[in-house]
Amino acid sequence: MSREEEEKLLFPSFAFPAECFPEAATSGGEQKKARQRRRRKVKPEAAAALAGESGGDEQAKKRRLSDEQARFLEMSFKKERKLETPRKVQLAAELGLDAKQVAVWFQNRRARHKSKLMEEEFAKLRSAHDAVVLQNCHLETELLKLKERLADVEEEKAKLAAVAAATTGGGGGGGGGSSSPTSSSFSTVTYHPVLAGQFGVEAAAEEADLTYMSEYAYNSYMLELAAAGYCGGVYDQFS
């Protein structure tokens, strides 16, 4: 295969020039022209959107208030929160604004004022709540201290009661032991008429003396008699 044949196979455009395909060339030109026409043509929706944007910019410029207008409206708001329709029209005429624009400004200003009042009220309530919480903490601390003091007092009271019980128990035992001699010392003795006749004592007087004589006194009395030598006669009388 020669070189020219190879080039024709690789590059058919060289082998078949544009004159051989007139329809393809014409259709390509028409497509190019249609594409250019579409680019030049502007859709009505896009045009309306552009017009709306320009109009919106103008309206935004109209809505912006100058510093003097804002100050005047602020002063009017301090005097009266809500305006009637004639007053709105009057303010709009004085400031060179639309009555609807003045009404919207007052509506927004009332909303901001209400929001500010709510924030202030919330701050007051929160401060009061914090104060109550702090007071509650102090009261709880004081309650714990009082409970501790009460526990200490109860413990001290229990200790004192135990000491008093121990003291009372020891004293009662000692008293019981010492009461025996006392009761025995005051015990009576039996009247012996033999002794009364032996020593020549009257019966009534001797009975009265011996009735209130204790055992200790009686024993001492008998010892004295034995030492004086009278016991023999007494025992003889009993025997």
UniProtKB/Swiss-Prot annotation:
Entry protein name: Homeobox-leucine zipper protein HOX12
Pfam hit, one: Homeodomain
Encoding gene per record: HOX12
Keyword DNA-binding on entry: yes
Compartmental location: Nucleus
Chief location category: nucleus
Annotated DNA-binding residue span(s): 58-117
InterPro entries: HD (IPR001356), HDZip_class_I_plant (IPR045224), Homeobox_CS (IPR017970), Homeodomain-like_sf (IPR009057), HTH_motif (IPR000047)
CDD domains with a match to the protein in the record: homeodomain (cd00086)
Keyword Coiled coil: yes
Purpose: Probable transcription factor.
GO BP terms, alphabetized: positive regulation of DNA-templated transcription
Gene3D superfamilies in the cross-refs: Homeodomain-like
Top-level lineage group: Eukaryota
